[in-house]
Amino acid sequence: MSLRALKTFYNFNIGNCFKRLYSSKDDVLKRRQEELMKRGLPKKKPLEGVKNVILISSGKGGVGKSTVAVNLALAIARQPQAFKVSILDTDIFGPSIPIMMNVNDSPLLGDNDKMLPVTNYGVGCISMGLLVKEEQAVVWRGPMVMGALNKMLFGTDWGDTDYLIVDTPPGTGDIHLSRSQTIGVSGAVVVSTPQAVARADVRKGVDMYNKMGVRVLGLVQNMSSFLCTNCSHKTHMFGEDGARLMAEELGIRLLADIPMDPLLVTSGDSGVPVLVSHPESSVAKVYKDFANKICSQKL
């Protein structure tokens, strides 16, 4: 047998071995998946006293999702109906809600041994940032993370809450899957910036919620433009109308078009959100209109 024929013979047999190996594994995985699907999803537990649960999510980090979550919560709380609102920060490894909301105290325990949300500006907050020291890193594996999330979710006395705003970590991982399968979610808001790299992840986020049967309330285009404070020239630093076009493509509603405003940065860093520090500013009015769209929907 020639060297060329020998190589062909071995390549053919090795290829067939791999095909048999992987097709065998695929068959096993397929059967396992079918068995799990027959069992059905875990039964969802209601959150006592909570009427609406809204997830604030993003396909990638750095799009201002937590800023959107904080200011939306405050804007809903300031609607004429005087809704009772709380924020749950589920970003275990990088919680930012305590800084933005200027809350530092550990939650107290109520008579039922459940945590009481730490309240500021009329909005209750629960976050991992309130349960560990500020300089302490959370270095946990999946099961511990899920345990902590369940503790914050079901181990908190939410009282009579009209809207629970859940600030989720970026991406489409276990935390999103767990929240959507264990509690009744009223809807999800997806946050994106206009540039293509962020929009590409929006599709994944919307697809994830569609697969989990979670209603997507709409898309928020954040950091859409920058208005110069000296000459009032508007600059689209990350492209123009990218998220708006994405919303049209996906058939979902564009809930808000939020500009880059220095007030949002300074107010967030100081722990006095713009809805509190500058309630009559143009960007605060954008959030009020956004909140009105959420509250006017039948959830």
Q: Residue spans of the language-model regions?
A:
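Phosphate-binding loop that captures ATP/GTP phosphates
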Residues: P80-W140, M146-F154, W158
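Glycine-rich phosphate-binding loops of nucleotide-dependent enzymes
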Residues: I126, T168, Q181, D289
